[in-house]
Amino acid sequence: MSKQSALLSAPSSSLLLEVVEGALVIQHWGAPLAGDLSAIQTAIRPSIANSSWDAPQFPGIMRESSRGFLGRPTLSGHRNGKAWSTKFEVSNFHHDGNSVAITFTDFHAQLEVLITFDLDRHGVLTQKAVLKNLGDSQYALNEFIHWLPLPKEATQTLDFAGRWSNERNPQRKEIATGTWVRESREGRSGHNFSIADIALTPQTTFQTGKAWATSIAWSGNSHYLVEKLFDGSQSIGAGELLLPGEVILSAGESYSAPALISVFSGQGLDGIASSYHQHLRSRELHPKRPRPLTLNMWEAVYFDHNEEKIKALIDVASEIGIERVVLDDGWFHSRRDDRAGLGDWVIDPAVWPHGLAPIIKYINDKGIEFGLWFEGEMVNPDSDLYRAHPEWILHEADRVPPLWRHELVLDLGHEGAFNHVLEQTSAVLAAHNIAYIKWDHNRVLVDAGHLGSAGVHRQTQAIYQLFAELKKRHPGLEIESCASGGARVDLGVIDLVDRFWTSDNNDALERQTIQRWTAQVIAPELLGTHIGPTHGHQTGRTLELSMRATTALFGHAGIEWNITEATPDERKHLATWAKYYKENRAHLHTGKMVRVDYPDSHAYLHGVTAHDLSRAIFAYVQLTPTLTVHPSPLKFPDLDPSGTYSVKAVFPAGKPRFMLISPPEWMSGVTMSGSALAAIGVTAPILAPANAVLIEITKL
C-alpha cells in the first residue's frame, strides 16, 4: 500500500482506498478486512492483455478518459466547449479514524473536487462531493455521479418500480455488459423512484448472501447506474440528474452533489435494511418520543368538513385511544373540491365560520394532538394567488404546463412565491396549537422553468429550505412527507421530516408488499401505516379487521376510516389493538426487521426481533391461497439458539378467518428453544387468503 491509503472499517464491512499514480483507487468495498494489507496493491495489480494499454491504467474514482477509462466518467462539464476532459491529481489526503477527505485538483481545467467518505459503526458509507470552479470563466456542469466498484461475484441487481398506489415493486435482473440506468425525471423522487439500487449474488436472499446497496440522498431528478465494461470491471453509482444549464458555476462557486448512502451486507437483504435502520436511528434528528397513534380524517370526510361530523369522529377516536388527529384537504379558502384553492392558505370562513381554534380545542381537551394538511408547492389556476401572480409558476417561455389534478407547480425558487408559502403557512401554525403537518405534493414537474432556465434543482433546494425554516420558527413541529402517497420517500428529505406517507393505498393486502420493500431502506417507525376502511377506497377489496390491523401495526400506526361507522365489536377491537400498539411500539420501532425466506410464495412471514434477542413479534400473512393443504412450517431466525422461548398467537384486533376445523395447538402457547424455532419451527395455521395472525415470542 502507498503512504496515502486509508482503511475504514465497521464490524460488517470495510472500505480500502489508496492513491495510485495520482488517482484515488477504491481497492475494496465489502467484507471486513484485517491484518497486513501492504501487499494488496501487488496482489491485485492487473496484467497486460493483448490489444490493450502498454501499462496498467488506474483511472480511480474520477473515472477519467485521460487515465484510460472507457466508461461513464464521474464528472462531465465544460467551459464553453473547453475544459471538457480532466486529469485530476490528489492534492490533499486526510484520514481520521473512519473518515477520509480527499482533494483533487486539475489546474489545467481549473477545477477542484473534495470527496469525503465516512463509514459509521453500522456499516453505512456516506459519500459526499463538492466541485469548485477555480477559474475566472463559467463552468457548465452536466453531471456528477458517485461511483463504487462491484466485485465480479455481484451478477444481479435489485431495484424498485411502481406507480401511484403501487409503489416500490422489486425488479431483480442479471447485470449485462453495458451501462444500465434508472432515471427519475418527475421533479420529485416519484412513485417509480428506486429507493435503492442493490447489487447481489444469485444466492442472496433476505437472510443470507452478499449485497451492495446504494441510495441517493436527493428528492429531485436523479439517476442510478450500473456499468459493466468489456474488460470485466463493474461499478454502481448514482447522482442528481441535472437538466441543461441548471448548474453553471461562476468563478469561486461550488456545487455540492447529493450524498450517496451505501451499505455492504454479508447477511442478505435484511443485513442491508438493518444497517440503514440503525444508521437512521442514530441521527440526532431521529424522532425520540413514541410515535403517536394517528387518525387521518381524509377517507372519513373528504371535502365534507362538517364540524359536528368531525366532533363525532373525535369522540370515537378518543374512546379508541387515538393520540393525534389530522384534518386533511379542504379547510382553506374556496377548497370545496380539488379544482380550486391551492395557494390560498387561509382558513375558509364558509366552512369554519369560527376558525379552526374551537375544533382544535375540542381535540386537545381530549388529550389528542392536532395536525393539518398543506400542499404548499402547488397552485390551482382557480385561486386568488394564481390570479394575482400567474408568473409564479414553474414554466418555460410563455407556455403553461399541462394540468395534473387541476394543479400547477409554484416556483419556490422565486422569492415572492417562497415567502408567500412560508408566511401563510407559518401564520396558520403560529395562530393554533398544531403539532404536525402533512405536506403533500400531488403532481409531477414538467416544462419546469425558472426565469428562462431549468428549475428542478432550485425547486428541490427550496423545499428543503422551506421545511427547515418552518421547523426553526415552530420548535417541535413534525412534518410528514406525502406526495400522492409515497412519491417523496428518500434519504434527501429525511432529515427534515418525521414521517413518510408510504402510499395512498390503504388496502392491507397491497400494503404488505409496499411496506415490505419501503422498509428496505426506511426504518418502519418513519412509515405511516394505517388501518383503512373495511371496503377499500382504492381497490374495492373487503378485508378482515384483523388483517388491516396486523398490517398497520408494523410501522407508525394509525387509522384512515370513518370509525363512526364501525360496529361496537370493531370499536372494541380497535381499542384493544391501540393498547397493543402502545405497549409494543418501543419494541417494533427499535428492533431488527426480519423477513423470513419463507418457501411458500403465497405467504409472508416477517417480524421484529429485539437486539438482545429477548423477544420478537412476527406476522404470518396468507396473501393468496396455498397450493397445498398444509403450508410450510413457520421458522423463526434471529433468536438465541440456546435460549428458551414461549410462543403464542395473539389477536389484539380479533381473530383472522381460518380455513380449518381446529387450529394448531401451539397457538395457545408452547415452550421451545431458539434453535428448535429456527430449525423446526411451528405448524402454520391454515388461513383464508388476505388474512394474518400475530405471533409473540418471549425469552424465558
Regions found by a protein language model. Give the residues of each.
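Active-site neighborhood of glycoside hydrolase catalytic domains
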Residues: 353-355, 389, 393-546, 556-558, ...
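Polysaccharide-binding surfaces and accessory modules of carbohydrate-active proteins
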Residues: 4-16, 24-227, 644-662
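Carbohydrate-binding surface patches
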Residues: 12, 196, 598-641
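Glycine-rich, aromatic-flanked loop segments that form ligand/cofactor-binding clefts
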Residues: 55-85, 206-222, 263-285, 322-329, ...
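Aromatic-lined carbohydrate-binding/catalytic grooves of carbohydrate-active enzymes
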Residues: 288-423, 436
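Short Pro-Gly-centered flexible turn/kink motifs
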Residues: 247-265, 690-697
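Conserved, mostly hydrophobic/aromatic
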Residues: 12, 129, 252, 325, ...
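C-terminal beta-sandwich/jelly-roll accessory domains of carbohydrate-active enzymes
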Residues: 624-700
